[in-house]
């Protein structure tokens, strides 16, 4: 603390002057879009959100074509459904690295962050759903003297 305290009464006045929680403001670029990056495993997604008809494009393809499995499509739409904003935003994403599952998670993370930048009021809903938290689980590295990260080579007693 910068100030020196001489008595307990002064401590009470200093504690009351603490700043309030930060107010989140809308962050848009020159075209009126919200931009965010999402990450999952080795995948990194760059996501732009703007008002529109609900069209989602991933790497210049419709998301139904890029993510053919219904589970991955559902993962992608979770933040939009949770915030009741289906059909209100056009989403453009470019994603690279990792496999399809990691890429779907990265796009979901990016969509969630971009929605909060566009509409800060959605932050509580998306935070409660766990969409704003970066899933930090990555593949454990292989160790020498082992077949994989934890799997040992076959042991022969004799």
Swiss-Prot record:
Record-linked Gene3D superfamilies: 3.30.230.10
Q: Which domain of life is it from?
A: Bacteria
**Entries under InterPro entries matching the protein:** Ribosomal_Su5_D2-typ_SF, Ribosomal_uS9, Ribosomal_uS9_bac/plastid, Ribosomal_uS9_CS, Ribsml_uS5_D2-typ_fold_subgr
> Single GO cellular component annotation?
cytosolic small ribosomal subunit
BP-aspect Gene Ontology terms: translation
The UniProt keyword set, sorted, is:
Ribonucleoprotein, Ribosomal protein
- GO MF entries: RNA binding; structural constituent of ribosome
Q: Which family does it belong to?
A: Belongs to the universal ribosomal protein uS9 family.
Return the protein name: Small ribosomal subunit protein uS9
Per the UniProt entry, what species is this protein from, by scientific name? Answer: Brucella anthropi (strain ATCC 49188 / DSM 6882 / CCUG 24695 / JCM 21032 / LMG 3331 / NBRC 15819 / NCTC 12168 / Alc 37) (Ochrobactrum anthropi)
């Amino acid at each position: 603390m910068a100030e020196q305290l001489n008595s307990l009464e002064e401590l009470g006045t200093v504690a009351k002057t603490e700043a309030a929680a930060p107010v989140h403001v809308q962050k848009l670029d020159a075209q009126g879009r919200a931009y965010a990056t999402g990450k999952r495993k080795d995948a990194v997604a760059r996501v732009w959100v703007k008002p529109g008809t609900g069209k989602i494009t991933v790497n210049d393809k419709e998301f139904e074509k890029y993510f053919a499995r219904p589970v991955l499509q559902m993962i992608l739409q979770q933040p939009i459904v949770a915030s009741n904003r289906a059909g209100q935003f056009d989403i453009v994403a470019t994603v690279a690295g990792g496999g399809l599952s990691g890429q779907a998670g990265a796009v979901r993370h990016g969509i969630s962050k971009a929605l909060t930048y566009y509409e800060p009021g959605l932050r509580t809903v998306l935070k409660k759903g766990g969409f704003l938290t970066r899933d930090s689980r990555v593949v454990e590295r292989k160790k020498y003297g082992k077949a994989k990260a934890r799997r040992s080579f076959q042991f022969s007693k004799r």
